[in-house]
Each structure stands twice: as C-alpha cells, then as structure tokens.
C-alpha cells in the first residue's frame, strides 16, 4: 500500500465516524476513596506493596489492640479485603521497610522516650520475610534508639536498600546506611540533616524531601554522594512519598495542618501542589 493510499484510508475512516455504545461518563482525576479498614488500627507501622497487594507490619504501641499482639502482627490487603498474615519473631515498633509483599525487608525501630520498652535486637536489626515467615538478619551500624532507620526515609528492595536519617537529629546518629542483602554499610551524611523525612527511588537514584525543621529541602542521592534540589512549596516534614527520583508524589505531614491534605508532585525539575486529598 502506498503512503498516499494509506493516508486516504485513514482519513476516510475518521470521516465515517466512530461507533460508540453506552453512556459517556467521566471520573474525577486524583480523587481518594475509602476502602475496607484493616483488622488492627496501627500507628507508626511499615507499609509495603501497592494498592492491589500491600502488607502492613508492626505498630508503635498506639493501637487499641494489646501491644504484644499489634507489634508482632502483619496483615495483607489484596485489593478488596484485609486478612491476617504471619507474625514477626520480635516486636516491631517505629521501624522502616523496603521490598515487596512476600519479599519484605524490615529494619530498625524504637524512638527514644517511647512509652514502650526497647526490644533488643530490633532497634538496629533486620527482619526478612519470604511470604511464609519472618527471620532476623544483619544488624545496622548505628545501634541506638533514634538511629537512622527510625521513622526516616527508606528505599529499595529486599537485597538492595537504603535507610536515610532518623526521627530526630543528633550528631552521632546522622547517617545513611545501605543494605546489600547481607550487610549494612555507612554512606556520607545527608547535607541538610533532615530527620523524619520522606524518600523514594532506588539505592543509586534516591530523592529525600523535608524533615523536622528542614521541610524546605530536596536532596538527591546517586549511590555515592548527595546533591541539593528545588524547594518544595509546602515545606513538609513527617509525610510519605512514592515514585522515582524524577517522578515523585508526596502527601501528609507531622501535624493536622490543613495544607498537609495536599499532595505534591515532582517531575525531576520542579514541584507543584494539587490540593487533592
């Protein structure tokens, strides 16, 4: 078929019209909807996966359920309902996680001044899940409460993870650690020392945003060193984040301020607020 004949055929198809059946409807873009609640109301827990298959792990001690139950429990959401999953071998409070459902990596835990006792071996320990059970693995280098894994940012997979910062900064604890599936190693300190931050991406292409007293910062990590980026409009701390270094979304924050209902989008160059919640 010649190019001129193909052009004639295509234009003729459009002139003849398109046959549509049924009502034409529209759906709001960027809207939130409520789904079934989990069995345990959790606080400061780990969430891994996506909206069709996600696992919730541990609790900070705020759950109405007994601490001995909530802090070792896990639940899986299959896109429609929540159901109980395997228990952890140790209580897991205020830690962080990476990986995916059935290949979970959980690390760190316990904030200083917490109203629940520290659990030896977990505030700088690592737990791995395989879909059937959880087992303990390597220890992180910073072995103190409020270490880099306590409510900081984290990215990666079960065998390649990055733990960034901590809950509240202290000179001896401002570290970034990388896990290679067997051991943890220290990385250069984050320049802005943004504790309680949010982060996403990969071990060699991470983005870290906000933090207590440093909500205005955006920082990039390339696997070796840090670089600063543009200031986000809302300057949040204690939020959550998803996406990649060049296509990220952040939401929430450390208080109930109205603007914490907004989402912020990053395209690799600049930030925009959506005012969708």
Which residues fall in each region the model found?
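Polar, enzyme-active/binding microenvironments
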Residues: 1-277
